[in-house]
């Protein structure tokens, strides 16, 4: 959401890896989307790179693998050496966004449900067997999403963040506002770099 808003504010700044892959880069990332193969992913990225970028390149922090597609070395190396920004939001807001995104249509429900047993095995098959599916089937979607965030996704994210240094933290609970703040921060950062290079 934030990446799309930044693109609206500064056309051409963003590289949407998830959009090009048709996958949100998680175990549930294909729900409601059409994942592509590596060849299509590479072709889409090559087309986007040929279009060029009129300013800095803004990319959502991803793992090397987005769905079944691998981020090319050149892009991955640039990501690893890039300035890192961290976005945080309250739990209730994140739950609202995820429910709206993943359960936007009835067609999304069955593919999502089909992945829950796998997550149960990762959380602990004895304690969690059938629990997530039951939450889903009984309409306790908010509770389900909170469990997934608290016990599955957030720990994975925290592990992947080890060793990363963030230049700035932002409150992402208002997409329009945080996109404006990020654009302003980037433009100020670039302006300072230019001034320093001229000294």
Give the positions of each predicted feature.
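Hydrophobic alpha-helical scaffolding
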Residues: 34-38, 84, 139
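Conserved NTP phosphate-binding and transfer environment spanning the P-loop NTPase/kinase superfamily
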Residues: 78-82, 88-199
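A polyampholytic, Gly/Pro-enriched intrinsically disordered region
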Residues: 1, 34-44, 105-112
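Short hydrophobic-aromatic micro-motifs
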Residues: 59, 86-87
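Glycine-rich phosphate-binding P-loop
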Residues: 1-10
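Conserved active-site beta-strand-loop modules that form the wall/rim of enzyme catalytic pockets
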Residues: 3, 55-57, 83
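Conserved nucleotide-sensing/catalytic segment adjacent to the nucleotide-binding pocket
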Residues: 9-79
């Amino acid at each position: 959401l934030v990446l799309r808003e930044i693109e609206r504010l500064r056309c051409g700044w963003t590289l949407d890896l998830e959009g090009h892959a048709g996958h949100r880069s998680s175990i549930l990332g294909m729900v409601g989307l059409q994942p592509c193969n590596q060849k299509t992913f590479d072709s889409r990225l090559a087309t986007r790179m040929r279009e060029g970028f009129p300013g800095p390149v803004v990319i959502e922090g991803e793992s090397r693998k987005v769905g079944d597609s691998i981020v090319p070395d050149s892009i991955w190396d640039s990501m690893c050496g890039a300035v890192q920004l961290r976005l945080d939001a309250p739990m209730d807001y994140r739950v609202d966004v995820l429910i709206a995104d993943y359960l936007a249509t009835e067609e999304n429900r069955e593919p999502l449900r089909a992945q829950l047993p796998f997550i149960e095995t990762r959380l602990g098959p004895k304690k969690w067997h059938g629990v997530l599916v039951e939450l889903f089937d009984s309409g306790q979607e908010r509770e389900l999403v909170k469990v997934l965030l608290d016990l599955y996704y957030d720990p994975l994210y925290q592990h992947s963040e080890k060793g990363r240094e963030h230049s700035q933290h932002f409150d992402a609970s208002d997409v329009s506002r945080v996109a404006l703040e990020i654009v302003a921060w980037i433009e100020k950062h670039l302006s300072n770099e230019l001034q320093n290079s001229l000294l």
